Amino acid sequence: MATIWFLPLLFLSCLLLAALRLKKRRQHQRKPPSPPGFPIIGNLHQLGELPHQSLWSLSKKYGPVMLLKFGSIPTVVVSSSETAKQALKIHDLNCCSRPSLAGPRALSYNYLDIVFSPFNDYWKELRRMCVQELFSPKQVHLIQPIREEEVKKLMNSFSESAAQKTPVNLSEKLASLTVGVICKAAFGVSFQGTVLNSDNFDKLIHDAFLFLGSFSASDYFPNVGWIIDWLTGLQGQRERSVRGLDAFYEQMFDLHKQGNKEGVEDFVDLLLKLEKEETVLGYGKLTRNHIKAVLMNVLLGGIGTSAITMTWAMTELMRNPRVMKKVQSEIRNQIGGKSMICLDDIDQLHYLKMVINETWRLHPPAPLLVPREVMSEFEINGYTIPAKTRLYVNVWGIGRDPDTWKDPEEFLPERFVNSNIDAKGQNFELLPFGSGRRMCPAMYMGTTMVEFGLANLLYHFDWKLPEGMVVEDIDMEESPGLNASKKNELVLVPRKYLNL
């Protein structure tokens, strides 16, 4: 009889003890400061058109670790170099996965890519393969002839405009340059005079960027948001965009099968070879969809970030004539009278590298990086960050933090003189490519494109504002979206440097 009562009492005692321990644990947990929100939507109304700017303003009141509720999703934003270090280095393994987002899920064939895939064995093996085969320093040097060819075409175009003293849309030209390099390196096909140089291709790329950076209700209300996306037409637009990109990839595969491509071995060749070798990634063999997902990363990542950085750099240089004169003098003195800059010359252009670092500080291409998802609970500054929390790092705000940078709104490349700070992910004051396990694997490729492109622009030409325009007329507005590009295009007049 005693045994009958003993077992239920033991069970209830265990439940009570567990409840008390849970209550005590919760009492010791500290949530980060949080701005007040509304029922259902939480803090969504506070995001604004440019979330990185809105969140930076909020962090000035609520601190560098801030908890918000975006719909039903708990979200933490870190906005200082110290808190970024804690998240991306000290606790990197706790928060190096990715959240489930509708646009990335569709474009990546259900997370078969490098950027948006959750953290697992498949992602680790895919990243290792891509770093070794696609983004290694060896591969970056192998495609240097492609960069040189595309830059030469651009310089010839500017020479024609200079002879006629006509303005050029530099934003558009730099975007075409990066598209040309990426398409030749990835697909073995020139941009000009091919299927790529069409309104349809431009629309495919534009729509893909739009879906990656626009508001999707299902990202914030997972259970019912898909209904809103369906009613607004977003779901249908997304599906059409994915079908269009899929058809484009298939067209590129057909060109390779038929041998109708140009030049040396490209990214598609390398990936198709790995598919033929039945390369195993995590839970299965490399398939055509895996290749398409990786090509999406190469295409969208390569086209967006390099052109954005070069455009912002030229914008800042036009607003700062002293810096423009200094960087051009360095380049022209170092290069001498050569008709073309080579990759080895770039290593000697120290002030140019400072100009680029300063551009990344003020204008990181992805101002909030790509969001992370917390896998296991950890603490930042004594605040508990639970599992399943979405995590953003506001690198745009970190670059403007007066506790880190003197005169943070001033464009001053000299701040990097005798400084060990660089953009390689170990200095948390400057994180244009992120840090930790989810750092951009194509950092070296992107940096090389920016350095080589800018060096040629500044070596071959002097740049003037269109007639009737003064420095004060240059606007600095950013466009909304995942990438913070210049909202209004930069239009300048090239003038041939006569001493060449």
Curated annotation (Swiss-Prot):
Coiled coil stretches, renumbered: none
CDD domains found in the cross-reference section: CYP71-like
Protein's membrane topology: Single-pass membrane protein
UniProt keyword list: Heme, Iron, Membrane, Metal-binding, Monooxygenase, Oxidoreductase, Transmembrane, Transmembrane helix
Amino-acid positions noted as binding heme in the UniProt annotation, renumbered to this chain: C440
Transmembrane segments: 2-22
Primary location class: membrane
Enzyme class, UniProt record, top EC level: oxidoreductase
Record's subcellular location: Membrane
EC number: 1.14.-.-
Similarity comment: family membership: Belongs to the cytochrome P450 family.
Name the UniProt record assigns to this protein: Cytochrome P450 71B37
Organism: Arabidopsis thaliana (Mouse-ear cress)
